[in-house]
Amino acid sequence: MPKPEKVQKVEELYQKMLNANALIFTEFKGLSVADLTQLRGKIRPLNAEYRVVKNTLALLAIRKIYPDKDLEKFFVGPTAITYCYGDPFGVLKALVDYAKEHELLKFKGGIIEGEVYSADEVKELAKLPPKEVLLSQVVGAISAPLSSLVWSLKWPVNKLVWTLDAIAKEKEKISINQ
């Protein structure tokens, strides 16, 4: 029978995982406490937290959320989880930048909005701009052709109005001169 402390720890991990929209798994072997504190300080403003976990307990918790996914590969060796509660791409960028400075931080993979990604895929996702920028680019790409269409459709009508206005002014001049 499991100890109550372990059951409570699994429940805490489960709640954190459930509330996060992304989980990034890393290996931290060789990093000092000061290094990890510095990393936590970089991602905290991005609405994320970095926690070292016990593999067996984390695996029990994550299986409650993703029972059909093969996640055991992420829980081999020393493991830390970055819980992202906000924009995961900003956090990924911060983690990748930190890993460039501290080569001992290694990516194992991640789960972003329910999809499982390998370590290489996580690094590639870090190159994407934030969600708001992507959305504005999509809106811009959609609205530009629509604006052109509106102007194209309005142009003949505007031209007709200007022509009729010019004719009316010309007739007005003629009637004044008579």
Curated annotation (Swiss-Prot):
Protein's UniProt keywords contain ATP-binding: no
InterPro entries hit by this protein: Ribosomal_uL10, Ribosomal_uL10-like_sf, Ribosomal_uL10_bac, Ribosomal_uL10_bac_type
Pfam families for this protein: Ribosomal_L10 (PF00466)
Alphabetized UniProt keyword annotations: Ribonucleoprotein, Ribosomal protein, RNA-binding, rRNA-binding
Single GO MF annotation: large ribosomal subunit rRNA binding
GO biological process, one term: translation
Transmembrane segments: none
Record-linked SUPFAM superfamilies: Ribosomal protein L10-like
Gene Ontology terms: cellular component: ribonucleoprotein complex; ribosome
Entry keyword annotation includes Translocase: no
Annotated function: Forms part of the ribosomal stalk, playing a central role in the interaction of the ribosome with GTP-bound translation factors.
Subunit structure: Part of the ribosomal stalk of the 50S ribosomal subunit. The N-terminus interacts with L11 and the large rRNA to form the base of the stalk. The C-terminus forms an elongated spine to which L12 dimers bind in a sequential fashion forming a multimeric L10(L12)X complex.
Protein family (similarity comment): Belongs to the universal ribosomal protein uL10 family.
Protein name according to UniProt: Large ribosomal subunit protein uL10
Protein source organism: Dictyoglomus thermophilum (strain ATCC 35947 / DSM 3960 / H-6-12)
Organism classification: Bacteria, Pseudomonadati, Dictyoglomota, Dictyoglomia, Dictyoglomales
